[in-house]
């Protein structure tokens, strides 16, 4: 039995040609809109936990600028820091001051020996004393102040306190380097000049500390603020007196 197959020549058997528009669409790659890099970067920075390495990530020009504003405390130090406190500057400043104190004392002792008023040589005990006083004072007082402020709900950052007290030590560097030449003067004149230099360093550092800590301490109340500032001044005077008697006398 024969079957007849009818083929519809007009039927749509599929498209056999490409239009120019379809070909262009196929060749054109699909591009995605650019991701907001700034927002994603900020989000990643906020999500990244703080590490001790971050506090040493500071440029030399920033450290120099902070040292200048410490010696010339005309602006708020935390405005200069701009929420980027560091430990790199405080560590090297404190270490350099310790070495400068030891060097200054050794040169002074040699000058006294050369003029027949003392014995030559240096004492390693002075180096240990310098390290204990400077490192101990900077760390203990900063942590103690931070703890008191946190207890009174002022919520300062520990890194800010350590950074502030660390940079405050820079004033003792020029003082320690300026004292040896005056060891050749008479005893009375030498003592007067050294006390004047120590007093200048003390005054500059007190102005620097109180100027920057006053707005923070004020959050704890007027009475406690006065007490804290008084304690800051007293402890800093004790530091200056210790340096004067041990290294500059």
Swiss-Prot record:
Keywords per UniProt: Membrane, Transmembrane, Transmembrane helix
Keyword ATP-binding attributed: no
Compartment(s): Membrane
One annotated GO molecular function: small GTPase binding
Signal sequence extent: none
Major location category of this protein: membrane
Entry's transmembrane regions: 87-107, 131-151, 164-184, 188-208, 228-248
Membrane topology: Multi-pass membrane protein
GO cellular component: endoplasmic reticulum; Golgi apparatus; membrane
GO biological process: vesicle-mediated transport
Assembly and oligomerization: Interacts with the YIP1 family members yip1 and yip4, and several Rab GTPases. The C-terminal cysteines in the Rab GTPase ypt2 are essential for the interaction. Interacts with snx3.
Entry's family note: Belongs to the YIP1 family.
Cited function: Possible role in vesicle-mediated transport. May be involved in proper membrane localization of Rab GTPases.
Name the record gives this protein: Protein YIP5
């Amino acid at each position: 039995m024969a079957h007849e197959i009818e083929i519809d020549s007009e039927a749509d058997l599929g498209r056999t040609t490409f239009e120019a528009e379809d070909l262009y669409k196929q060749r054109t790659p699909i591009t995605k809109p650019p991701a907001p890099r700034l927002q994603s970067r900020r989000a990643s920075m906020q999500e990244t936990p703080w590490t001790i390495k971050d506090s040493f990530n500071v440029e030399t020009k920033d450290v120099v600028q902070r040292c200048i504003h410490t010696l010339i405390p005309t602006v708020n130090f935390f405005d200069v820091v701009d929420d980027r406190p560091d430990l790199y500057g405080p560590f090297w400043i404190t270490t350099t001051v310790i070495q400068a104190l030891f060097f200054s004392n050794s040169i002074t002792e040699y000058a006294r020996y050369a003029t027949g008023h003392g014995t030559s040589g240096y004492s390693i005990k002075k180096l240990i004393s310098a390290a204990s006083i400077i490192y101990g004072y900077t760390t203990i007082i900063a942590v103690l102040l931070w703890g008191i402020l946190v207890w009174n709900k002022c919520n300062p950052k520990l890194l800010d306190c350590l950074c502030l007290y660390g940079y405050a030590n820079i004033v003792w560097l020029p003082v320690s380097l300026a004292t040896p030449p005056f060891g050749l003067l008479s005893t009375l004149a030498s003592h007067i000049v050294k006390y004047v230099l120590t007093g200048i360093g003390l005054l500059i550092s007190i102005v620097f500390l109180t100027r920057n800590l006053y707005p923070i301490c004020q959050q704890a109340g007027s009475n406690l603020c006065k007490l804290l500032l008084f304690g800051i001044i007293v402890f800093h005077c004790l530091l200056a007196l210790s340096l004067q008697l041990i290294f500059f006398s």
